[in-house]
Curated annotation (Swiss-Prot):
This is Protein CNPPD1. GO terms for molecular function: cyclin-dependent protein serine/threonine kinase regulator activity; protein kinase binding. It comes from the Eukaryota. Belongs to the CNPPD1 family. The chain crosses the membrane at residues 233-253. InterPro entries: Cyclin_PHO80-like. It is found in: Membrane. One of its GO terms (cellular component) is cyclin-dependent protein kinase holoenzyme complex. Its main location: membrane. Keywords: Membrane, Transmembrane, Transmembrane helix. It is a single-pass membrane protein.
């Protein structure tokens, strides 16, 4: 029974013609899509975008890496040689990544081998061993040594010697863990994305996604975001402060302009003495209560004597005005002793200077009745009033004398 008969189902619908597209690994489709998208293999399967040869960015990375690994100047590896060998030998991306794993092992286990081999021979023999490990004998994709020699321009005996020396340097340990393959794939993707972005001057969305998966780029991006956040906070604080300062300045200017346009109020009168005490002392009229003259005098003298005793040290003494011309009448009434005196310089009863001198004509109304001049608010007040300096001390003495004369 042939293979086609074994693969037929009950209905006989399976065809062997599509067997080359059959995938045995579950993640093969995802891996192929990832390689095509991130390693610049393209999506057009009908043209030259298949996975049977290396893409141009991958070829550049391979040349750079192998030149550093094998620094021998003999047969130095070139990109044209890489493209020719990969096209003639149908090198897949997985074989190329496995060859990079082998070269990395040689750098750590046997660096002397890399010093004696050329970079072109190292590329050819590493790709041949990786392809033989992936595609075992009996597969259609296998390539014999003569074909590899023809693709690389090397004789078969020389190629066999290179293969034996390579396997001896590797200690025949060709097994590779799949995690190592994916680590190399991730590293290769980041190198390709960074190199192509720098060459173009801008990065595609796929390149940015690849770079952000790397820990170094994540750390750099995180620090950049932190600095941007700090700068934004500082700018926000500066903006708010400037706005607040501008508002405060406008308020101060508006208030100052309002105060300058309004009329300035007159300064308050800082007087500690009531106005009625600073006015000229006018002789009071004779009280009508004749039965108790002393009580009337005590009531009229009690308040001035209290305020005078408190405010007399605080108020400066008023200078008396010049004496007017002598009055025509020979008699004057003293407000301290309530008696008529002639024109003596001092009062005989209280021994105070006599300043009760009238300066105008005598009004017959209050002089004929023996009364003192009217009050300031009286409608018949004299046109000129002579200010008088009354001593509160003398008033107190007069009150005591009156209480002695008129007891009770």
């Amino acid at each position: 029974m042939d293979l086609a008969g074994l693969l037929l189902d009950e209905e006989g619908t399976f065809s062997l013609s599509g067997f080359q597209d059959f995938t045995f690994l579950p993640g093969h489709q995802k891996l192929s899509a990832r390689i095509r998208r991130r390693l610049y293999y393209g999506w057009d399967l009908e043209t030259d975008c298949s996975l049977e040869e290396l893409s141009s960015p991958v070829a550049d990375i391979t040349v750079e890496l192998l030149q550093k690994a094998a620094p021998s100047p003999i047969r130095r590896l070139q990109k044209k040689y890489v493209a020719h060998v990969s096209r003639e030998a149908c090198i897949s991306p997985c074989a190329m990544m496995l060859a990079l794993v082998y070269i990395e092992r040689l750098r750590h286990r046997n660096p002397d081998y890399l010093q004696h081999v050329s970079s072109s021979d190292l590329f050819l023999i590493s790709m041949m061993v990786a392809s033989k490990y992936l595609y075992d004998e009996g597969e259609e994709e296998e390539v014999f040594n003569d074909e590899w020699g023809a693709a690389g321009g090397v004789a078969v005996p020389t190629l066999n010697a290179l293969e034996r020396s390579f396997l001896s340097a590797m200690d025949w340990r060709l097994y590779t863990d799949p995690r190592e393959i994916f680590e190399v794939l991730s590293w290769l993707e980041s190198c390709v994305a960074e190199q192509q972005g720098r060459r173009r001057g801008w990065y595609t969305y796929t390149d940015l996604c690849v770079l952000l998966e790397q820990p170094m780029w994540q750390l750099s991006l995180g620090s950049l975001c932190q600095r941007l956040v700090k700068l934004s906070c500082l700018l926000a604080v500066a903006y708010v402060s400037s706005v607040a300062l501008a508002v405060a300045s406008m308020a101060v200017i508006h208030q100052s302009l309002g105060l300058s346009s309004s009329p300035s109020p007159s300064p308050p009168e800082l007087t500690l003495v009531p106005k009625n005490l600073l006015q000229p002392c006018i002789p009071a009229p004779v009280p009508q209560c004749l039965t108790n003259v002393s009580s009337c005098l005590e009531d009229s003298v009690e308040l001035p004597s209290l305020w005078g005793s408190l405010l007399d040290p605080l108020t400066p003494p008023l200078m008396p005005p010049p004496d007017p011309p002598a009055p025509p009448t020979p008699f004057h009434k003293c407000p301290f002793c309530q008696k008529f005196q002639r024109n003596p310089p001092n009062c005989r009863a209280c021994h105070q200077p006599n300043r009760t001198v009238s300066i105008g004509p005598i009004h017959p109304f209050y002089h004929t009745h023996g009364l003192a001049p009217p009050w300031l608010w009286s409608p018949v007040a004299p046109p000129f009033l002579q200010p008088q300096q009354c001593s509160l001390f003398s008033v107190m003495k007069l009150a005591r004398l009156t209480s002695v004369i008129f007891p009770g």
